[in-house]
Curated annotation (Swiss-Prot):
Keywords (A to Z) from UniProt: Cytoplasm, Metal-binding, Methyltransferase, S-adenosyl-L-methionine, Transferase, tRNA processing, Zinc, Zinc-finger
Protein species of origin: Caenorhabditis briggsae
Protein name per UniProt: Probable tRNA (uracil-O(2)-)-methyltransferase
Keyword Metal-binding attributed: yes
UniProt-listed PROSITE patterns: ZF_C3H1
Lineage top rank: taxon: Eukaryota
Amino acid sequence: MSPWRCIAEQLVEYEEPVDAKAYFDKIICLWKEYPNAISNRINTSVPVEEESQVWNEVIANFESKYRFDPANSSELSIFKLIQRDYKRQSFSNNCYEVAFYEEELLVRFYPIVLDGQQHPHFESPYSIACKIPSNSSILLQFFKPVDTPDDHFEFLKTLAFKQLVTWLKSIDLSKTTRKTHSLLDKESYISTYRHIREDLGRPLVEGWTENSKPQKVIFEDCGIASYIQELITSGILPKPRKFVDIGCGNGLLVHLLNKIGIPGYGVDVRSRKVWKTTLSHVDLRESPVDPQIVVENRPHFDADVDLLIGNHSDELTPWIPVMAAKLNCNFFLIPCCPYNFFGKYLNNGSHLGPKRMTSQYESFFEWTVSVSERLGFDTKMDRLAIPSTKRLCIIGRVPEKGLCPSLEQTIEHMTQGQKFVARPREIRNNNCMHISVTDRERIAKKLFDFILNASDDVRDGWRCGGEVPLAQLAGQLTDDDKKLMKDQDGGLQTFLRNHHQIFHVFQATARLRDFRQPVVSRRQQTNPKKQEATNRPKQPCWMSLNHPDGCPLGPESCRYLH
């Protein structure tokens, strides 16, 4: 092998002394496990089992190509790289990277393909290394073989190196990193996901009529359905006779699971429009779920239900392990909004041990895990690869020896004998919308006048007023005004946003809305029908009636009635 030359380096400094070796090992681990963070061509990486047939084939190919045997190298590892677009014939679907430590702070990477196609990650060998200028700094370096053209490494020494530096700066060795799909065969999951997304999800996207963004909503449920299928395939969960998706929302997950041969139904306190259109053939039931009924041993679900699913089930989330325990069945749960048994979850961290700091969501997740464990479930946790910020899941399986022997007392102790109150079928959306018309108009006019008089700025003959901090604007409200907003679960900013024809709120300031400078919402960008609907005149033009210069657009161009 030819000599190596450094093509990129950066010094990273810390406020306190750091363990450089531990930091280096951590970023190497991240680099191997998350190639998708480096290249959008790669979906994931899968470690190759040592001394397996594939391992030996890769090593033989390596020796033939690079003319040396890596078998005696320190911490030798081989990863298979799964490309994102498997239909692209120009890239290899049988590609690998061989990595080993040549020195304590130097790792060599060598690409290998077994099908003669182009490697989708990096086609040439490269190295990652670091030096230790001081006990509170690390010099990170990238190397390439001297005889390899520089243009092969343009991406590696810019964007890829930048990601590596970002990791090095943000490492927290005290924090446990949850690996994505740690319970599954990643390659098998990707194959299942591709099938469900393309064969079932893609037609749904093309025919989607809801306001929500179809790619996110549908592909997220494709990922969850794929994950549940792989739990069953791997034996982590047995195939259910029938599942019930509690708080099923739009019902897409129920539809997808049914389509891949997993029988079950969904239940939600409120039906959705899509139930009667796209998903009219799916068993989706409009009914409140009362866990107290299950706790009291009264029938609530179909008798043959043996898997409970909670996908963002809000206030029912902690009750799903409890209901599963009473039914002696398994459960799959993705906690979302933090609720305890009878209200909002408050992070006191008592279940996490002394002096452990954590986020609200992490604390809630760990508390929900502790509920499952106290009930006696064989409890596993994992991280899903879905387009959501809440993607940690809990899998609870009834062990062969059964759940905890004192189940009734455990449930009574956890719930403290209180009664669950289900949410109403129709949720009243306050947000300052039910303040009387007289009060709304009075407050809006007062705030309008204050902003208008805050500046003498005039644009094309129209007085624009000033840009006023919300804190200053709040000073114009009386105690009675504030109480009106508070009673409606809102505040000044909510009130202003509700009157978007008059006010524009941006970064803790408010100014008058000037429709000569239109602002299109993200919802309107993703839904042209919504944009068209908002352009139709429905309300009188506030500026025409109240602004001393009238409407800046005039009746021909204004979207409101003149």
